[in-house]
Amino acid sequence: MQPPPSLCGLALLALVLACGMAEVWGEEREMPSAPATPPLLGASEILTPSTKTSWPRDSNASLPRSSAPAEIPKEGRTAGAPRRTPPPCQRPTEIKDTFKYINTVVSCLVFVLGIIGNSTLLRIIYKNKCMRNGPNILIASLALGDLLHIIIDIPINVYKLLAEDWPFGAEMCKLVPFIQKASVGITVLSLCALSIDRYRAVASWSRIKGIGVPKWTAVEIVLIWVVSVILAVPEAIGFNLVTIDYKGSYLRICLLNPTQKTAFMQFYKTAKDWWLFSFYFCLPLAITAFFYTLMTCEMLRKKSGMQIALNDHLKQRREVAKTVFCLVLVFGLCWLALHLSRILKLTLYDQNDPNRCELLSFLLVLDYIGINMASLNSCINPIALYLVSKRFKNCFKSCLCCWCQSFEEKQSLEEKQSCLKFKANDHGYDNFRSSNKYSSS
């Protein structure tokens, strides 16, 4: 029995990733931690030299890494070869407090909507047997990953932002980014598997969708979670709790340690931004574009009069394909700003440019917009399903209105009741006719 192409693709992808660069979301989901530390992107350039020396600039904060060598004086530097520091910014960026309030409000909104939406989505798929098919199980896997991120990471990040400290210890410092990266990996790989599954469903017109979880879909989900966890391991290794001296007080900061012990982790830290952009952003968009193009060509190639009996079945598959495309589109829009800010930092930022301060302010604002947009992705998938899919919309209404019975069960119950009423009326009419016959005779 030949495995489906989607499983083969995921297995090949897992092998390449495990043997190659086992990297994961380094900065994207933990980025709310950057503004929590007092030295900000623009403000750090007007700090005193003693403060700069104590602050580990080459960290996982929202500072361009390229600015670290020029900004931090090295103790081992010879006196005869001084290194000129770039001119400081005239004024700091005044966005820190504003970001605190905005990020707290957005995080609370994501927390409430995400728990309600994702838990409702999981309950719908669990309670309704007719909803337990391959695509919906992949959607449930995606919702479970988002739910883990919402419950564990968002409250810790909000507290860290408001308290400007990390009181949770070194173990949680490694666990929180690990869960964050695994959650993003589950989202990316689930969207790739959904796109491949939709092409297979449309290409095999005669394959009737059944109720239940296909065996290969279950294997795909296990593979998705295993690969996501493997890719998150470097974050648990690289992150550490660092104590810095800032204005006479000691702050504990959870960050990717600037000095990694192994050569692989040094390479991991250096190539992180490009890896994040290519795998965690471009890959799902490229796979969706490729397989949806093939799916469109396949649909146009089929004759219009072919298999008329399957018209309703094909309409359902097209609706599911539209739903998956909507999920991928929402993912791309939510993560575009944050990835754009990372790439601009790598390509445009010059530490010796006298006009770099304006670019720093722009990148900082773009970072903050991207942080909040990326946070919305954890709660927006159930909303997108509600707006796009009629079946999910009816199930959401049924579940959120606290109706214990599922939508399909209620619909079948109403049909049974109407049939019973019709039979009862028909039986009464037959009795009436027989009684009339009796009386007339």
From Swiss-Prot:
Molecular function per GO: endothelin receptor activity
Positions in the Cytoplasmic compartment: 126-136, 197-217, 296-323, 389-441
Glycosylation sites: 60
Biased composition (Polar residues): 47-65
InterPro entries, per database record: Endthln_rcpt, ETB_rcpt, GPCR_endothelin_rcpt, GPCR_Rhodpsn, GPCR_Rhodpsn_7TM
UniProt topological domain (Extracellular) ranges: 27-100, 163-174, 243-270, 350-361
Disulfide bonds: 173-254
Residues bearing PTM Phosphotyrosine: 438
Keyword Cell division among record annotations: no
Matches recorded under CDD domains: 7tmA_ET-BR
Signal sequence bounds: 1-26
GO biological process: calcium-mediated signaling; developmental pigmentation; endothelin receptor signaling pathway; enteric nervous system development; regulation of blood pressure; vasoconstriction
Residues the record lists as Phosphoserine modifications: 304, 418, 439-441
Lipidation sites (S-palmitoyl cysteine): 402, 404
Residue span of region Disordered: 30-90
Gene Ontology cellular component terms for the protein in this record: plasma membrane
Function: Non-specific receptor for endothelin 1, 2, and 3. Mediates its action by association with G proteins that activate a phosphatidylinositol-calcium second messenger system.
Homology family: Belongs to the G-protein coupled receptor 1 family. Endothelin receptor subfamily. EDNRB sub-subfamily.
Protein name: Endothelin receptor type B
Organism: Oryctolagus cuniculus (Rabbit)
Gene: EDNRB
